[in-house]
Amino acid sequence: MIASEIFERGVQDPFCQDCDYEDETDVQSFLGSNDLNDFVNSKLASFSFQNSSKSNNSHHSSSTNAGNTSRHIGNHTIGHHLRKIKTAPHHLYGFVPANSTNNSNEPIRPSPRRIRANSSTLIHQLSRQSTRQSSLGDAADSCFDHKCIKPRSRHSSCYGIPTHLYGLEKYVSSELDSLAVANDQSNDLTSPLTSVSTPASNSNSYLNLNSSSAAYPSSYLSNEKNNRLKLISHGKISSNNVPGHSGNLNHYHRERTPSNLRRESFSLLSNGSSSSPLQTRNNSYSNSLVKSPSNSSLNTSVASSNEESSPHTSNCLEERNPRRKSFIKLSLASSFSN
């Protein structure tokens, strides 16, 4: 808990001195305030005594023990002007009671000056870098340099704070954000197009096959057919080039099932006409198209074209597929026999 509070203070104020004296209260509570003050004063007295003995040997030899004690008492006031002693755990060997054998004339080592890395300067240096690759490389170099200049005193909990981590928000490049936004916009734009294109691909095959008849009105098709018939009568165009039923492919590729054949035979018997089987088949097919409720506009155009081009369809069918006539005759014969 204490370390977290010191960490927060060190981050908020990088120049604070709380880390230098973080262990002083713990040591005082452990040894007691009176014993600590007496021991520090005795250490300061011995330190000042050794310095004075080196500077003035003659005066030290002529002085008596009483004079030495009085000099020690008079120099106790120097401790108020000196810097506080480091009280880290690895310095606790000095806080041994005075009656122990380790109480030698060993002077107290001055505390090393601490080299602290300012987190704000590190963040400022990282924020000045331009690209993401260079920032990663420079951050690695700065971390290596920061390890090289680590302080000698390791007692502080503030040492080891990864202050360069506060510049990580700079690593999130704006280019990545722009690419993500562009991808989202492209997905939003392509989704309605795909939804519109799917029903177009799944449209009715009958409408796709009859696109020519659906695109043009019936009046236009009838006028075109009349013009072709006039050209055929004058001998300018051969009858082989005349498409039957306005290019309706379903008329020639109609599924030949037994039910359809029976329907054709029934229509032939009910009409009682002496026309050819192909002509009766065309008439029955046109009637079935007219009676169907779906695609009424397309069926009426197909029926009108059937009635106009009925004299020519037999020739076209015989020339295109000569086996169809024999097949129809055999099917009609089998239906009559049944």
From Swiss-Prot:
Residues 50-70, 267-306 have a biased composition (Low complexity). Residues 307-316 have a biased composition (Polar residues). Coiled coil: none annotated. It comes from the Eukaryota. Residues 50-75, 267-322 are annotated as: Disordered. One of its GO terms (biological process) is aerobic respiration. Signal peptide: none annotated. Pfam families: MBR1 (PF17058). Belongs to the ISF1/MBR1 family. This is Increasing suppression factor 1. It comes from Saccharomyces cerevisiae (strain ATCC 204508 / S288c).
